[in-house]
Design a protein with these regions (language model features):
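Hydrophobic aliphatic residue packing
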Residues: 10-11, 24, 178
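PLP-dependent enzyme catalytic core of the Aspartate aminotransferase-like
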Residues: 122-126, 149-198
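Small/polar loops that bind or transfer phosphate-bearing groups
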Residues: 2, 31, 178
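Active-site C-terminal subdomain of aminotransferase-like
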Residues: 14-115, 119-156
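Structural preference for beta-strand elements that scaffold enzyme active sites
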Residues: 9, 90, 115, 173-175
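Short, solvent-exposed coil/turn segments
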Residues: 4, 24, 111, 169-171
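Single conserved hydrophobic/aromatic residue that forms the stacking wall/gate
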Residues: 1-7, 11
Length: 198
């Protein structure tokens, strides 16, 4: 969610965890009456309304949100524990005590999501791409928040010279979204694919 500096407005995307299947477009606003009246007037002029199918799918997804988030969190925790033992990988995930965000995360949040970053030490980018491409249970993409596990190599999201994270020499970023599959299957899949890293 995005909160304004005055903390009177909250904007939430409903395209991700809310529906749980990466198949809707939507968002929600929690605003004061003054802002609400402006938004309502703009909505009438532009015709931007949530479609009935999207509204139905989001409502249906909300019924299982807590159960799904528990599973995402537990699966991600197990995978984070497995990956943190690998010397080639620096885990970007607030659950780990050595994470630079751990204290803030602990103060403000009761759990983590299924999204994590891996800073991978490798001599060449090709082996990192091979690692991602050889994952059998992970789809490729960045529609985080759905039921399925996804993997994305950093460079496929760079635009021009802009980089989303500062990486050291021989470091490559892979982002993982951990889905609802059996965590032991996901760990086995990651383990077999890690053999491609050089």
């Amino acid at each position: 969610p995005r909160t304004s500096s005055a903390a009177s407005d909250v904007y939430k995307r409903q395209t991700k965890y809310y529906s749980g299947h990466s198949d809707v477009m939507g968002g929600s606003l929690a605003v004061n009456k003054k802002v609400f009246n402006k938004v309502k007037a703009a909505e009438k002029i532009t015709g931007l309304r949530l479609g009935p199918d999207d509204a139905y799918l989001i409502t249906r997804g909300l019924r299982t949100l807590d159960v799904r988030l528990d599973r995402h969190r537990e699966n991600a925790k197990k995978i984070a524990e497995f990956l943190s033992k690998n010397k080639k990988i620096k885990l970007l995930y607030p659950y780990k005590k050595n994470s630079h965000n751990f204290r803030m995360w602990k103060k403000y949040y009761s759990g983590a999501s299924g999204l994590m970053g891996l800073k991978i030490k490798a001599k060449n980018e090709k082996s990192v791409i091979k690692f991602v491409n050889n994952l059998k249970l992970f789809g490729h993409g960045y529609s985080w928040g759905g039921f399925e596990s996804l993997a994305l190599h950093q460079n496929t999201r760079e635009q021009g010279n802009r980089s989303f994270f500062k990486l050291a020499k021989n470091e490559h970023l892979v982002r993982l979204h951990i889905g609802l599959e059996d965590p032991s299957d996901l760990i086995a899949d990651i383990k077999q694919s890690l053999k491609h890293l050089k």
